[in-house]
From Swiss-Prot:
This is Orotate phosphoribosyltransferase. InterPro entries: OPRT, Or_phspho_trans_dom, PRibTrfase_dom, PRTase-like. It catalyses: orotidine 5'-phosphate + diphosphate = orotate + 5-phospho-alpha-D-ribose 1-diphosphate. Keywords: Glycosyltransferase, Pyrimidine biosynthesis, Transferase. Gene3D superfamilies: 3.40.50.2020. It comes from Neurospora crassa (strain ATCC 24698 / 74-OR23-1A / CBS 708.71 / DSM 1257 / FGSC 987). Orotate binds at F37, F38, T139, R167. One of its GO terms (molecular function) is orotate phosphoribosyltransferase activity. Catalyzes the transfer of a ribosyl phosphate group from 5-phosphoribose 1-diphosphate to orotate, leading to the formation of orotidine monophosphate (OMP). It is an enzyme of class 2 (transferase).
Length: 233
């Protein structure tokens, strides 16, 4: 496997050093026991926020320059997506002011406001604009479908999604049989909406980059987890 690009390697190291990416034994919503856990809500310290905003911005710029992504507004779904989207917007303007100096951001409210400016959306109006959703991870895809529905209701056009981590993990089987092959939530969203979805890091990236940053036992357990639950897409 090729070495990680510098921004991915820097982000991975910051995530591990800052305790955002942890290794151990963690029960997920799916009831699977994962040897690693990533919590973007732990990027609350200024230096860690700098690390994640830089990684998001460089991932977005890379996708934009390759012609895979074009957008007008960065959208952060409430709640975790709000600081991620605003920080990414600011970092985009810092890294490339000529291209992104006037880029806008928006986010949604969980409950509509019935006074003042009212409505569900805070920030730039979405109508007729290409919207890039920025969030932490895609688990089952439910939250992203809700965000897409809100954007479309406001007249926006979803241009793509960028997340911090792609677990590359198959969805739980409806009958509970985890031995069956299956697609990932990210793959299902790509197929359902026909939009590009990007991740700063994938599970493959984590396994490649964690050597030397985590114990050999943690590397082995993470490799075993990938082999057991890796998606078919």
């Amino acid at each position: 496997m090729a070495a990680l690009s510098p921004y991915k390697a820097d982000f991975l190291k910051a995530s591990i050093d800052g305790g955002v990416l942890k290794f151990g034994s963690f029960e997920l919503k799916s009831k699977r026991i994962s040897p690693y856990f990533f919590n973007a809500g732990d990027f609350y310290r200024a230096d860690l926020l700098q690390a994640i905003s830089t990684a998001y911005a460089k991932c977005i710029i890379e996708a934009h320059k390759s012609g895979q992504l074009d957008f007008d507004i960065v959208f952060g779904p409430a709640y975790k997506g709000i600081p991620l989207a605003t920080a990414a917007t600011d970092k985009l303007a810092q890294l490339d002011p000529e291209t992104y100096g006037k880029i806008c951001y928006s986010f949604d409210r969980k409950e509509a406001k019935d006074h003042g400016e009212g409505g569900n959306i805070v920030g730039a109006p979405l109508k007729g604009k290409r919207i890039l959703i920025v969030d932490d991870v895609i688990t089952a895809g439910t939250a992203k479908r809700e965000a897409i529905a809100k954007i479309e209701k406001e007249g926006g056009i979803v241009a793509g999604i960028v997340v911090a981590l792609d677990r590359m993990e198959k969805l739980p089987a409806a009958d509970g049989d985890d031995s069956k092959p299956g697609p990932s939530a990210m793959g299902e969203l790509r197929k359902e909406y026909g939009i590009p979805i990007f991740a700063i890091l994938t599970l493959d990236d984590i396994i490649e980059g964690m050597r030397g940053l985590a114990s050999p036992e943690d590397v082995e357990k993470t490799e075993e987890y990938r082999a057991k639950y890796k998606a078919t897409d």
